[in-house]
């Protein structure tokens, strides 16, 4: 199943995900993940289906379903996610650069309705991405 197909299916089942997501289970340690960083507010872990030599996700522990639904009071937490992405990228040796992506909604190919940053690098990335 393609990532776009997964996103379309997730959008249909978004109300089901409202109670729990894959990322909620990772936060609660109910399913394994290769965790790189964790504190009280954020978690970073390797993507299970990497799209680049280095591909990790950064998520807030407090669930925001999608960027579109973020409110002013979420600003500090979203900023924290960006800073965490930068710190982890440095830790993983991505000094030559990397890309940060947020998929938002069905057309943005969001497949898990828990805000997350994709951080991709480890090679020369192309533009436009598609």
Curated annotation (Swiss-Prot):
Chain location of the short sequence motif Histidine triad motif per the record: 114-118
PROSITE patterns linked: HIT_1 (PS00892), HIT_2 (PS51084)
CDD domains according to UniProt: PKCI_related
Domain of life: Eukaryota
InterPro entries, per database record: Histidine_triad_CS (IPR019808), Histidine_triad_HIT (IPR001310), HIT-like (IPR011146), HIT-like_sf (IPR036265)
Pfam families: HIT
BP GO annotations: purine ribonucleotide catabolic process
GO molecular function: hydrolase activity
Protein's name in the database: Histidine triad nucleotide-binding protein 1
Gene name per UniProt: hint-1
């Amino acid at each position: 199943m393609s990532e776009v197909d997964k996103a379309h299916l997730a959008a249909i089942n978004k109300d089901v995900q409202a109670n729990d997501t894959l990322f909620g289970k990772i936060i609660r340690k109910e399913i394994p993940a290769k965790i790189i960083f964790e504190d009280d507010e954020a978690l970073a872990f390797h993507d299970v289906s990497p799209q680049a030599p280095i591909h990790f996700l950064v998520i807030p522990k407090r669930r925001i379903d999608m960027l579109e639904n973020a409110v002013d009071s979420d600003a500090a937490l979203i900023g924290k996610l960006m800073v965490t992405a930068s710190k982890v990228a440095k830790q993983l040796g991505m000094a030559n650069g990397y890309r940060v992506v947020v998929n938002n909604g069905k057309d943005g190919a969001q497949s898990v309705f828990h805000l997350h940053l994709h951080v991709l690098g480890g090679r020369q990335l192309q533009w436009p991405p598609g």
